[in-house]
């Protein structure tokens, strides 16, 4: 059989030929399920279609869905690499019917594909059905001709699927392939069903019921949801029992072998497989907008990346490896998933940065491990809690801890480690809040179902008329909002923009006969329901009330300028920094804009200046900003920039601005539902304020436009003029004059420090004779006040040089009354005196605790600087003891 890419295509083509709509994979970050960390099944994007909340223009669909299982309930991470079929990333092939065909057609379509299109031998196939699903049982006999011996009734929940405690549910029917009696294992439902002989290749779910509290009802329009793992069916069709022996996985593993020079079929086979699998998860997650971090989805990605990087080290890789594998993955899967082609530069940069950091983590972890295990001897057990701390806090893998200790005959307490891990997983499950609509937003589902979408008029006007369709207060629908009340209003149509895409919602006024209300904010719920947050100032707002609607013009104009400037800055950043720049978040407000983007390091002053100059070049050209409605696929194909993880409908708005002087094409082209200026000149000016880091690999640019930028520049100019007047120079000379003053101050500080040092060395300051002998040891004691703490060690070093052999102690009393103490011991006395012990004696007199450093130089301090002389005397006594 052909390769994985051809198998994927043949599945989709088969169902398209049979009347199904080919639907693109949804992102790995779920759009519509707040409980799910990652998309882990094909039906996830259709959840609201099955429940009736969402309508699609088709009743049959086919998909190849990218999935990740590496966190929460569905977690295959620890098994990956050590079995033939576990993955963190996989593709789920599926066909779906939304109230169209049911069991008979689903079974017929499945059977014809695997036996006629793919030529699987019928005598090696068997099916399971739910124990009381006689209809499915009879259909397998009728459609497939399976004998009773190869149709197995299963009484457990394995063959009954439910979306949750309530909602659509129904029996399943699974198709199994028999690999032959030379492989251990029994058929499904038998005591040894977990063997590898009988492998499930396809699961057909018959959604025919709706589960309600206490009862189960028949659905009026039963549906079909199927799932087939592409990796598993590809292995079968390519004549192997191992998913990692398919052509796609072999290509990645071959590249790992080439780069490490370690055979992929030898003792370290598992490491090759871990790297191949985790590379796919890492690149696809980055392409869908997830970046490594210490929480949520980013933390799971970091664990996946670092597990692969650990195995790269086990293969002997001395330099970062993972980023060098991205091209082979893009070559193998980029045609099916063009998002990884667009994200190739970002994924490469992210993997390189993460692996560089991880190598430092490993070095630090080994040092900490050595410290924690210093007192253990062969046969001892290393505390599991400490191993977990190394793993959780420092990212130090357990297997590395075990490897490092095994050579010393020390074993890790796995049970304690596992217990700590379980506690963390329980906390993570309890704390996971996810994304999407919150539970308190359920009221909007009812409003959406009854009233439909809100018609948005705001692209063309800032005033309109509308009628109240729903009123909501404290999460519940109400019939009216009296004067003084605050609540949410849904209208049949509105010019008010609802907060989305980083752009803040509009505010303004609504009024009708005897009623007025301020619109404080506007939000979008469920994608197309515009919700106006209002405070009624006069009269009573009721269902059906006709209203005049007026957006705050000045505020909207400022927002428009900032949104268009954001597009110009986005493209300018790509031109200056490279194609790896991708939007990671934004805020478009009336008074400022904020743009988060992928980039591994701070921008230089020159790069910031270039970005600002490019943006302002297009502002000054005052070219038209064009908006077109296009099919989403056509828009992306034409070069419009789509944001990773963003949900787009079948038709999208494409906003283009500026003309590229090189080729005449638009400078910036993005899919965007926001409001924009008519011409780039309406932006006025773009002023970049700052570049800062917000997360690993993510930078933030802050900027102003129009009136806000003008005010900022005026304030800066005024400050410059004032400073020039104070310094009695021209504005052009301010920078040089300030630099000279700063250097002059530094010189004065150096001179002052030198003077204090000379004063201290000149005669011991307030403590009398500079050098005394204590039991044959020379002791130089110096008490000073007001010195810079940074200078104390230099004074001690000079004192050690002066006395040649002995102990030097310097006590400083600061302006706030606190005391600082530094003690030094010359090299010849290192075995006799310990500076750390001596400084602790003096620090105790100052009212402090401890003190740290080295045996030859240590420091500490305390709140009572008035006892500096007493502290020096205490050290003298210790020398004489």
Curated annotation (Swiss-Prot):
Catalytic function, reaction form: tRNA(Ala) + L-alanine + ATP = L-alanyl-tRNA(Ala) + AMP + diphosphate
Pfam families reported in the protein's UniProt record: DHHA1, tRNA-synt_2c, tRNA_SAD
Obligatory cofactor(s): Zn(2+)
BP-aspect Gene Ontology terms: alanyl-tRNA aminoacylation; negative regulation of DNA-templated transcription
Keyword annotations: Aminoacyl-tRNA synthetase, ATP-binding, Cytoplasm, Ligase, Metal-binding, Nucleotide-binding, Protein biosynthesis, RNA-binding, tRNA-binding, Zinc
Primary localisation category: cytoplasm
UniProt superkingdom: Bacteria
Protein location: Cytoplasm
Enzyme Commission numbers on file: 6.1.1.7
GO terms, molecular function: alanine-tRNA ligase activity; aminoacyl-tRNA deacylase activity; ATP binding; tRNA binding; zinc ion binding
Coiled-coil residue spans: none
Residues reported to bind Zn(2+): 563, 567, 672, 676
UniProt note: domains: Consists of three domains; the N-terminal catalytic domain, the editing domain and the C-terminal C-Ala domain. The editing domain removes incorrectly charged amino acids, while the C-Ala domain, along with tRNA(Ala), serves as a bridge to cooperatively bring together the editing and aminoacylation centers thus stimulating deacylation of misacylated tRNAs.
Protein name: Alanine--tRNA ligase
Organism: Azorhizobium caulinodans (strain ATCC 43989 / DSM 5975 / JCM 20966 / LMG 6465 / NBRC 14845 / NCIMB 13405 / ORS 571)
């Amino acid at each position: 059989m052909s390769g994985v890419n051809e198998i994927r295509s043949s599945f989709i083509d088969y169902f398209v030929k049979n009347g199904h709509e080919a639907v693109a994979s949804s992102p790995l970050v779920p759009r519509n399920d707040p409980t799910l960390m990652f998309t882990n099944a094909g039906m996830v994007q259709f959840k609201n279609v099955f429940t009736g909340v969402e309508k699609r223009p088709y009743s049959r669909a086919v998909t190849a869905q990218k999935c990740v299982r590496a966190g929460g309930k569905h977690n295959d991470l620890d098994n990956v690499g050590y079995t033939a079929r576990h993955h963190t990333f996989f593709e789920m092939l599926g066909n779906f019917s939304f109230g169209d065909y049911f069991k008979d057609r689903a079974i017929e379509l499945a059977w014809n594909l695997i036996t006629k299109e793919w030529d699987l031998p019928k005598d090696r196939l068997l099916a399971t059905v739910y124990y009381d699903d006689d209809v499915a049982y009879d259909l397998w006999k009728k459609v497939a001709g399976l004998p009773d011996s190869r149709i197995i009734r299963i009484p457990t929940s394995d063959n009954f699927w439910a979306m949750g405690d309530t909602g659509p549910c129904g029996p399943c029917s699974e198709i199994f392939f028999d690999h032959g009696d030379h492989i251990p294992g029994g058929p499904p439902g038998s005591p040894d069903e977990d063997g590898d002989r009988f492998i499930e290749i396809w699961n057909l779910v018959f959604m025919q019921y709706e589960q309600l509290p206490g009862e189960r009802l028949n659905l009026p329009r039963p549906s079909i949801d199927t799932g087939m793992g592409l990796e598993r069916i590809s292995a079968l069709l390519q004549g192997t029992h191992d998913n990692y022996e398919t052509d796609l996985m072999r290509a990645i593993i071959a590249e790992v072998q080439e780069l490490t020079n370690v055979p992929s079929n030898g003792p370290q086979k598992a490491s090759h497989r871990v790297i191949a699998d985790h590379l796919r998860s890492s690149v696809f997650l980055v392409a869908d907008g997830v970046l490594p971090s210490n929480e949520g989805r980013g933390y799971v990605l970091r664990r996946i990346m670092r597990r692969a990087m650990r195995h790269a080290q086990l293969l002997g890789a001395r330099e970062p490896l993972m980023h060098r594998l991205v091209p082979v993955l893009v070559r193998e899967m980029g045609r099916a998933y063009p998002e990884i082609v667009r994200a190739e530069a970002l994924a490469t940069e992210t993997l390189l940065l993460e692996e560089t950091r991880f190598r430092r983590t490993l070095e630090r972890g080994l040092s900490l491990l050595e410290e924690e295990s210093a007192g253990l001897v062969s046969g001892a057990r290393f505390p599991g809690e400490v191993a977990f701390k190394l793993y959780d806090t420092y990212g130090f893998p357990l297997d590395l801890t075990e490897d490092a200790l095994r050579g010393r005959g020390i074993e890790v307490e796995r049970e304690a480690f596992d217990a700590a891990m379980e506690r963390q997983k329980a906390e993570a499950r309890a704390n996971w809040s996810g994304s999407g609509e919150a539970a308190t937003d359920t009221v909007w589902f009812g409003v959406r179902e009854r009233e439909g979408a809100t018609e948005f008029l705001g692209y063309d006007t800032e005033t309109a008329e509308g009628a109240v369709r729903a009123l909501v207060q404290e999460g519940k629908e109400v019939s009216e909002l009296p004067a003084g009340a605050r609540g949410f209003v849904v209208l049949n149509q509105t010019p008010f923009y609802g907060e989305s895409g980083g752009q803040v919602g509009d505010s303004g006024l609504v009024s009708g006969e005897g009623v007025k209300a301020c619109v404080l904010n506007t939000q979008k719920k469920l994608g197309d329901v515009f919700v106006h947050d209002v405070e009624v100032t006069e009269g009573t707002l009721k269902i059906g009330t006709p209203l005049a609607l007026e957006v705050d013009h000045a505020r909207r104009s400022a927002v428009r300028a900032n949104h268009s400037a954001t597009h110009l800055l986005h493209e300018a950043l790509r031109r200056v920094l490279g194609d790896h720049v991708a939007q990671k978040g934004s805020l478009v407000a009336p008074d400022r804009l904020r743009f988060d983007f992928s980039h591994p390091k701070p921008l230089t002053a020159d790069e910031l200046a270039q970005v600002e100059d490019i943006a302002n070049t297009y502002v000054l050209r005052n070219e038209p900003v064009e908006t077109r409605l296009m099919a989403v696929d056509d828009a992306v194909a034409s070069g419009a920039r789509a944001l990773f993880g963003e949900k787009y409908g079948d038709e999208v708005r494409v906003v283009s601005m500026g003309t590229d002087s090189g080729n005449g094409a638009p400078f910036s082209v993005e899919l965007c539902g926001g409001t924009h200026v008519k011409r780039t000149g309406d932006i006025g000016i773009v002023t970049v304020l700052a570049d800062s880091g917000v997360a690993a690999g993510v930078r933030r640019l802050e900027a102003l436009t129009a009136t806000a930028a003008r005010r900022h520049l005026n304030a800066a100019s005024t400050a410059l003029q004032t400073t020039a007047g104070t310094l009695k120079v021209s504005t052009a000379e301010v920078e040089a004059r300030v630099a000279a003053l700063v250097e002059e101050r530094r010189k004065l500080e150096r001179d002052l420090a030198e003077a204090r040092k000379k004063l201290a060395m000149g005669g011991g300051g307030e403590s009398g004779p500079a050098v005394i002998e204590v039991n044959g040891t020379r002791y130089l004691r110096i008490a000073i006040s007001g010195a810079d703490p940074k200078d104390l060690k230099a004074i001690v070093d000079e004192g050690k040089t002066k006395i040649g052999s002995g102990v030097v102690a310097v006590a400083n009393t600061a302006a706030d009354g606190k005391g600082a103490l530094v003690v030094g011991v010359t090299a010849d006395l290192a075995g006799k005196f310990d500076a750390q012990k001596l400084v602790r004696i003096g620090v105790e007199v100052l009212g402090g605790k401890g003190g740290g450093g080295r045996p030859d130089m240590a420091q500490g301090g305390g709140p009572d600087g008035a006892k500096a002389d007493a502290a020096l005397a205490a050290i003298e006594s210790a020398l004489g003891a």
